[in-house]
A protein has these predicted regions:
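A short, hydrophobic secondary-structure junction motif
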Residues: 16, 20, 24, 85-86, ...
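Consensus positions within tandem repeat domains that build extended binding/scaffold surfaces
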Residues: 17-20, 40-45, 88-90, 110-115, ...
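Repeat-associated, polar segments at repeat-unit boundaries in modular proteins
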Residues: 44-47, 206-209, 479, 483-488, ...
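Cellulosome-associated attachment modules in secreted, modular CAZymes
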Residues: 491-565
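Structural signature of tandem-repeat unit edges
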Residues: 1-14, 25-38, 47-61, 70-85, ...
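Extracellular adhesion/carbohydrate-binding repeat motifs centered on closely spaced tryptophans
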Residues: 53-70, 214-232, 297, 320, ...
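Polybasic, low-complexity, intrinsically disordered segments
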Residues: 396, 416-419, 438-442, 454-457, ...
Length: 565
């Protein structure tokens, strides 16, 4: 038996993954909470519970998990009221299915739920449905007409791809996203009605439709979205996007290497994913202050762009948006940005200086990977982690200050930073990752505090002239000895109440003192606090009675509370 709880570690359980209990042959009873709305592919296949279910629709809680057994021709399915979602692959490939009625309680149709149901001719949706998953009706080429309810907000990738007999579609006003290839190869789809407020239309959403084939060469619009550019673009083309356009669609100008200049009007709010990907001859881009978001990889491989100003109106920039912009020298990031995502400036080999706004709290993996001419960069105080390969290959980076809130330096974080000479790790850092400073050949000194409890393998490989500065019997000293790195011992700064000797007095010192009083030992089977060290002992013997006990714990708690006030 398995009982899925409502919450795990304080987080509501909403999903059960693919093959989560697959082939668990002894599993006879399953209880799931109402919070679960998504059950993955084959999550319970091969279990005794599933084998004992009668043929037909199989439910788990309020989720239609699967259809079991043989389905004969001309089958009409009425999904019962109260069902909130249809799971991934639930009816996939059932050729006998011809009609489906969906209740108003249903919110989501999962991936491939009706995929390849080629005899499906009639589907009745009810208002209440919000999410049509990826490939939900893929290759349902028996469908000729569908009416989507006004409640729908998301049409997934490839949702109706290959529905070759579908003739017209009205996209409801509440739809926010039409996914990549959502109606691709619906070759008889000639009429498409798109609301004026939609901004996000995916790559090739209408490719291969009669509607698209009937469009003239040049810019193609779907509602107020610049959907794409059709036909062969002449050399040295300049594009002026008309005012009133509210969005540049995903991949709209992708691979338009003949595009040299583009004028974006002040009506555009969103620049889509890959919108200008690999437009290698655009050398300048002016982003108007109407834009609020720029999608992933929007300008990736625009190798001629040398200067970009992101206006204050922009609050979101996607992953890898300027990756491989090898001519980019100057970039202005506004204070409105709080997150620099994965690979944002990766391989911008000519980028020399960048000012990161103080409000930024996250710098993603590979954000500045391969920026070999980057000399200086500021990391804002709100950043809590230096992630994997964030500054890997920044060969010209001379110095960098790691802020006091950083707790982790990720794998390869500063690998091949050949010009970095010295570095001080703050007291907040607990872990230095695998090969974090590998081949920092000019690195002469690094100061590592007692807060660091883990230094992973090869963290300083190739740092031939390195001296590690740290404290006696610390992880830093042990690492230096094990790897034959020169070590200089620092004199500990004695601070009243600093039981764990990391130069920070906080609640961790209370726990440390309590553990010492209880008789806990360190890894060398020595007492946690060296009571023979007069200075250390006196710093935690707060009532000065010559012994460490619960009275000192109480005084330490009061000291910390007073510091916070």
């Amino acid at each position: 038996e398995v009982i899925i709880p409502n919450t795990i570690d304080g987080k509501k359980v909403t999903s059960i993954g693919d093959e989560a209990f697959y082939e668990n042959k002894n599993l006879e009873k399953i209880t799931i909470p109402d919070s679960v709305t998504n059950i993955g592919n084959a999550a319970f296949s091969g279990t005794a519970w599933y084998e004992n279910q009668p043929d037909g629709m199989v439910f788990l809680g309020k989720v239609l998990y699967a259809y079991k057994g043989i389905m004969y021709g001309n089958t009409n399915i009425v999904i019962p009221d109260g069902t909130v979602s249809i799971s991934k692959n639930a009816f996939c490939g059932y050729l006998g299915l011809t009609k489906v009625t969906i209740p108003s309680s249903l919110k989501k149709i999962g991936e491939y739920a009706f995929g390849s149901c080629s005899s499906l001719r009639d589907i009745t949706f009810s208002n209440g449905l919000t999410d049509i998953g990826d490939k939900a009706f893929y290759d349902c080429y028996g469908l000729t007409d569908i009416t989507l309810p006004e409640s729908v907000t998301n049409i997934g990738n490839n949702a109706f791809e290959g529905c070759s007999r579908l003739k017209n579609i009205v996209i409801p006003d509440n739809v926010i996203i039409i996914g990549d290839a959502a109606f691709c190869n619906c070759e008889n789809l000639s009429e498409i009605t798109i609301p004026n407020n939609i901004t996000n239309i995916g790559k090739e959403a209408f490719l291969g439709t009669a509607w698209y084939n009937n469009q003239s060469d040049g810019m193609v619009f779907a509602g107020k979205v610049l959907y794409g550019y059709k036909g062969v673009m002449p050399e040295n083309t300049s594009i002026e996007i008309p005012f009133g356009t509210i969005s540049i669609g995903n991949s709209a100008f992708c691979d338009c290497s003949n595009l040299t200049n583009v004028t974006i009007p002040n009506s555009v709010k969103y620049i889509g994913k890959r919108a200008f990907r690999n437009c290698t001859n655009i050398d300048n881009i002016l982003i108007p202050d109407s834009v609020t978001a720029i999608g992933d990889s929007a300008f990736v491989y625009c190798t001629s762009i040398d200067n970009v100003v992101i206006p204050n109106s922009v609050t979101t920039i996607g992953e890898n948006i300027f990756g491989h912009c090898t001519s980019l020298k100057n970039i202005t990031i506004p204070d409105s940005i709080t997150d620099i995502s994965y690979g944002t400036f990766s391989d911008c080999t000519n980028l020399e200086n960048i000012a990161i706004p103080d409000g930024v709290t996250n710098i993603g993996e590979y954000a500045f990977y391969g920026c070999e001419n980057l000399k200086n960069i500021n990391i804002p105080n709100g950043v809590k982690s230096i992630k994997e390969s964030t500054f890997n290959g920044c060969k010209s980076l001379i110095n960098i200050t790691i802020p006091e809130k950083v707790t982790n330096i990720g794998d390869y974080a500063f690998t091949d930073c050949e010009s970095l000479v010295s570095l001080v790790i703050p007291n907040s850092v607990k872990k230095i990752g695998y090969r974090a400073f590998e081949n920092c050949s000019a690195l002469e000194t690094i100061t590592i505090p007692n807060s660091v409890t883990s230094i992973l393998e090869s963290a300083f490989d190739g740092c031939k002239n390195l001296t590690i500065m740290g404290y006696k019997n610390s992880v830093a000293e042990n690492y230096a000895k094990e790897n034959e790195i020169n070590f200089i011992e620092l004199i500990k700064k004695i601070i009243t109440g600093d039981a764990d000797e990391n130069e920070i007095v906080d609640v961790n010192d209370v726990t440390y003192l309590q553990r010492h009083i209880a008789g806990n030992k360190n890894t060398d089977e020595l007492p946690l606090i060296d009571e023979s060290n007069k200075d250390v002992f006196e710093s935690v013997d707060l009532n000065k009675d010559g012994k460490l006990d619960v009275q000192d714990v109480t005084l330490l708690q009061q000291l910390i509370a007073g510091n916070k006030e």
